[in-house]
């Protein structure tokens, strides 16, 4: 009987310890607004999105929203999978 309690204790302990180190992969989307009325090009949006992203954010798509904005979309890895205005759709990995 003591062995089964010990086994149960070890299983619960390992689950608690492993859950503390979960990493989340989150999709993010943000728009870049232009200061002047420019006609955004594919290259301009790509450059603007790369400048906007931090080191831990991978860009997988950029597109035009309208004549004054580009959309930047990508994936980032974070410790906490809480959605925000920019971060959406987090999955534990």
Swiss-Prot record:
GO MF entry, a single one = toxin activity
Tissue specificity here reads: Expressed by the venom gland.
| GO CC, one annotated term | extracellular region
- Record keywords, A-Z: Disulfide bond, Secreted, Signal, Toxin
Cleaved signal peptide residues: 1-22
- Origin: domain of life: Eukaryota
Disulfide bond entries: none
What does the UniProt PTM comment say about this protein?
A: Contains 3 disulfide bonds.
Record localization? Secreted
Q: Which family does it belong to?
A: Belongs to the scoloptoxin-15 family.
The name this protein goes by in its record: U-scoloptoxin(15)-Cw1a
Organism ancestry: Eukaryota, Metazoa, Ecdysozoa, Arthropoda, Myriapoda
């Amino acid at each position: 009987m003591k062995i089964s309690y010990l086994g149960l204790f070890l299983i619960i302990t390992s689950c608690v310890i492993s859950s503390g180190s979960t990493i989340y992969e989150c999709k993010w989307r943000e728009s870049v607004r232009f200061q002047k009325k420019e006609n955004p090009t594919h290259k301009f949006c790509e450059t603007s999105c790369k400048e906007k992203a931090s080191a831990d954010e991978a860009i997988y798509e950029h597109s035009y929203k309208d004549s004054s904005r580009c959309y930047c979309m990508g994936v980032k890895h974070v410790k906490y999978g809480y959605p925000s205005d920019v971060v959406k759709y987090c999955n534990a990995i």
